[in-house]
Structures are given as C-alpha cells and as structure tokens.
C-alpha cells in the first residue's frame, strides 16, 4: 500500500499543517511561559521528558507495524490493542522515574500525578500515527494541527476564566491528545483493521523486540541530558533556557515533514535516487530560509516567550544548525534503513540482524549520545562549580550537541557510498536557496529587523508577522525565477486549486 503514497502531496499536507500549527503552538507556549515561572516551565519540560521515557516499550509495536503495513499486511487492530496493554508497564515506569525526580525539584508530586494520564494516551497516539504513516501520511499532519489547536483553545479558556497554572498546561496536553487520537482514527482506511487479535503477529514482534528496543534506546538515551542537567545544578533554570531556545529552533524541523512519507515508500519498494533527491530538495527549500530568518530574529522571537529568555539568543544560534542537520540525518536514515530487506529473509538470526543497517545506523546515534552525555556531565559539573550563569551552561550544552551530531552525518553519507546506494545531493538547488536566503536576510536587516524596540507582546508578534511576510515575498520571488523545482510545484498547486474550485462550483 505504501507504493501508492505520493511523497510530495503527503509532504506538503504535513508541512502546511505544521506551519499553521506554528502559530497555534506559539500562542500556546507564549500563554504558558508568560504565566508560569521559569521554575514551573522547567518542571513541565521535565515531566514531558519523563513521559517520553515511559512510552519507550511501545516501540516494539510501532517499529514493526510500520514495516509490516508498508508491505501490505493488515495488523492494525493487533497493534492498537497490544499498545494499550503495554501502556500499563509504561505507567509503572513513569511512576518510578517520577519518584526519583520529584524530590530533586522541590517534591511537587501532585503535578507528576496529574500528568499520569498522558502515558496511555501517548501510547495510543503514537501507534495511530505509525499506522497512518504507513498508509496515509497526510493524516498525521492534519491530526497534529488539531492537537495544537486544541491546546490553544484550552489555554485561552483557562486564561480568560481562571489563572494559568502548571496543572492547566498539563490538562491542555491531555485534551489535545484525545482530539488527536480521534482525528487519526477517523482518517485511517478501514481495511487496515481486522476483527481479530493476531497472537502470531505479536509473537513475531516480540521475537525480535531487541532490535527496535536497541534503536529506540540509541535515540532516547540522549534525552537523559535533561535529568543530568537538573541533577547537577539542582535547578530547572538552565533547562528552561535551553528548551526555550529549542522551542524556537524546532520551527526548522517542520521542513523535515517532507521526509515523513519517504521511509514507508522505500520499504514498499520505491526507487531510492529520485524519491530521496526530491525529498532533500523540498527539505532544503524551506529549512535554509527558515534557519536564516530565525538567526536574524533570534532575540525578538525569544522575547515572545518571555523577556527572561531574550539572553538565550546564543543558545538559539547554535540550536539552529543542530535542528537543520537533524533533518538531513532523518533523510539519510530513511534511505539506509528503508531499503534494508533482512527482515524478509527466512528465519534471520541475531547475527544477521546485527550486520544489517537496521542495527548499524542506530549504533551511530548511540555512540554519539554516549559521548555527548559524558561531555555534558563533565562540562556542567565544572561550570556549576565555578558558578557560571544559566545561559552560559545552556550555550555549552548546545555546543556539545552540534559537535557530536555533525560527524554522524558524515559517517552515514560514507555508509551510503560504500553500500552502492545512489544518492545525489541537490547542490545546485541548495545554492539557489542559500543565495535567496542571503538576499532575504539583507532585506530584513535593511528593514530594521535588528533594531526592534521593546514593545508589548502583541505588538511584537504583529511586527514579526510583518517581517515574515516580507521575507517570504522576497525569498519565493527569487526562487520562482531561479529554481525549476519550485516553479513546477507552484504551477502544479495552481492546477490543483483550479480543479478544486471547478468541482465546488
């Protein structure tokens, strides 16, 4: 079924919904950060990190159901039911980590208890997203927009009726998760579900559960950095500054939406060269100008979250290339693992799997995470001993991450070359996007982007929207005149819009 996925269509639906959700997400995070203390905001980020650890067991299902469905199997019912069963173990894990973490940050057990419901909802949401990714990737983008919108509605209601608190922020996420699950279920093809629970499918997943467990461990071990930072500093202020910068930098990651449909497409047997190059071109088309724009507008963007975060602009500057590099990592990993066929072999052994790219690719991430955590622990301990500022420690944190993530990209590129994988980087397109972004930045600076005066939050948001409109106009006019790929997309979009209008009339 994945052969029928249209990467461009699914990518633009997903990217468009993420861009729309940027505004709702910005509204939500602004309401929360401006009404919570830095301590409470950092505590909230800690709770979210613990929830992410608690959903780790679910990867046993999601890893294999994506590969199964992409090849035409129909085990969606089994995946959903087994996911809900595993959520019980996830709750136990959440409570254990919370019992260790809560005393370190003031013993605020009530907030950890309120957030418990997020664990089973996250299990269900992640599994439904995986099922949609294999069959109808655009549904994930639509559901994400609903998720963000629901959070804003709850936050605004709370702001108007009663005071925003950490409990309100947690409740908003819970309501949004319920809405997201409902949309995903409504949009999924019914033929994916069978009226039976396949015990044999579950046995097959559990037999090789070590592989997705390893891959997920390799990816998630890096998130322990929040716990390390909190434990060493006995404070959430450094975490708050680091996360605030990454909230802004994460806008760039939305360009990675174009790679979302690539993995199941390749698993289903699509050719690598054309699909991967197209996805890389689309990703660079948006990530390059977004990176440039956020770099120039770093201080005002952080100020929206609260005046206390404006000094974290250097953290944001470093976080920008980290996120941009992450999008390229995502494409390289999809190419390397998407065409791996070891799981189709008859009774593959542990040794067979350990030699496959399903194992070697996450191994790169694991080694990088271990190096990063050790470096972070040593550096933070030293900086804390000399009473360095929270921003200084956050900058060091970001610098360590980029120094570790960059070599991994080179290694994955080398792996593709050695395996004979044909992958051509769109260097000419990227040069055009870089030139257009440079001109865009020059226009923004000339228009006063570096001299924004202190104004109210609402005025600042509208001022930034003006710069966004100006930057978009400059950038897209330039690439329309210079880039054939963008022109083809633009004309195709116009044709689709005309077709929709004709049908509506």
Language model: regions and residue ranges:
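Interhelical loop/hinge segments that connect adjacent transmembrane helices in multipass membrane
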Residues: 1-3, 113, 141-142, 166-172, ...
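Signature of the first transmembrane helix
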Residues: 4-60, 91, 95, 114-118, ...
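Alpha-helical transmembrane segments of multi-pass membrane transport and lipid-handling proteins
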Residues: 23-26, 57-59, 80-106, 157-160, ...
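Interfacial/gating helices of multi-pass transporter permease domains
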Residues: 24, 28-53, 166, 204-208, ...
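Helix-loop junctions and terminal segments of transmembrane helices
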Residues: 55-73, 250-273, 277-283, 333-344
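Hydrophobic transmembrane helix module of multi-pass membrane transport proteins
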Residues: 84-214, 442-445
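Hydrophobic alpha-helical transmembrane segments
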Residues: 142-190, 249, 363-382, 387-415, ...
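Membrane-proximal transmembrane or re-entrant/amphipathic helices at the cytosolic face
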Residues: 419-421, 428, 445-505
């Amino acid at each position: 079924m994945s052969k029928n996925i249209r990467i461009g269509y699914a990518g633009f639906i997903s990217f468009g919904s993420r861009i729309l959700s940027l505004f709702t997400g910005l509204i939500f995070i602004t309401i929360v950060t401006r009404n919570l203390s830095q301590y409470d905001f950092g505590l909230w980020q800690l709770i979210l990190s613990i929830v992410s650890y608690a959903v780790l067991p679910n990867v046993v299902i999601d890893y294999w159901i994506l590969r199964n469905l992409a090849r035409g199997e129909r085990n969606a019912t089994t995946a959903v039911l087994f996911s809900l069963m595993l959520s019980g173990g996830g709750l136990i894990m959440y409570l254990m980590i919370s019992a260790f973490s809560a005393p370190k940050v003031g013993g605020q057990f009530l907030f950890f208890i309120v957030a418990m419901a997020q664990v089973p909802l996250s299990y269900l949401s992640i599994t439904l997203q995986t099922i949609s990714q294999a069959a109808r990737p655009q549904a994930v983008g639509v559901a994400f927009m609903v998720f963000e919108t629901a959070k804003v509605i709850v936050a605004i209601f709370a702001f108007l009726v009663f005071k925003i608190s950490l409990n309100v922020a947690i409740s908003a996420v819970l309501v949004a998760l319920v809405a997201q699950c409902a949309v995903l279920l409504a949009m999924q093809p019914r033929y994916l579900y069978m009226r039976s629970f396949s015990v044999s499918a579950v046995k097959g997943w559990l037999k090789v559960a070590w592989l997705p467990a390893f891959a997920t461990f390799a990816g998630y071990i890096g998130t322990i950095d929040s716990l390390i930072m909190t434990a060493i500093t006995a404070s959430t202020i450094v975490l708050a500054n680091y996360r605030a910068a990454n909230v802004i930098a994460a806008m760039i990651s939305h360009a990675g939406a174009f790679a979302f449909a690539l993995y199941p497409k390749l698993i289903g047997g699509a050719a690598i060269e054309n699909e991967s190059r197209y996805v890389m071109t689309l990703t660079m088309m948006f990530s390059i100008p977004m990176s440039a724009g956020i770099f120039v507008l770093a201080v005002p963007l952080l100020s929206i979250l609260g005046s206390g975060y404006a000094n974290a602009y250097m953290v944001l500057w470093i976080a920008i290339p980290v996120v941009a590099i992450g999008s390229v990592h995502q494409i390289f990993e999809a190419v390397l693992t998407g065409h791996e066929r070891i799981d189709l072999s008859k009774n593959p052994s542990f040794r067979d799997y350990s030699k496959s790219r399903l194992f070697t690719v996450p191994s790169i991430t694991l080694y990088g995470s271990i190096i990063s955590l050790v470096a972070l622990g040593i550096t933070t301990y030293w900086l804390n001993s000399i009473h360095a500022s929270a921003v200084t420690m956050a900058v060091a944190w970001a610098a360590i991450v980029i120094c570790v993530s960059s070599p991994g990209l080179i290694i994955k590129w080398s792996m593709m070359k050695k395996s004979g994988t044909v992958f051509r980087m769109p260097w000419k397109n990227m040069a055009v996007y870089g030139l257009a972004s440079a001109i865009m930045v020059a226009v923004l600076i000339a228009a006063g982007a570096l001299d924004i005066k202190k104004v109210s939050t609402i005025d600042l948001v509208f001022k930034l929207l003006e710069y966004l409109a100006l930057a978009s106009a400059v950038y897209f006019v330039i690439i329309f005149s210079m880039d054939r790929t963008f022109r083809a997309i633009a004309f195709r979009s116009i044709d689709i819009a005309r077709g929709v209008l004709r049908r509506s009339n």
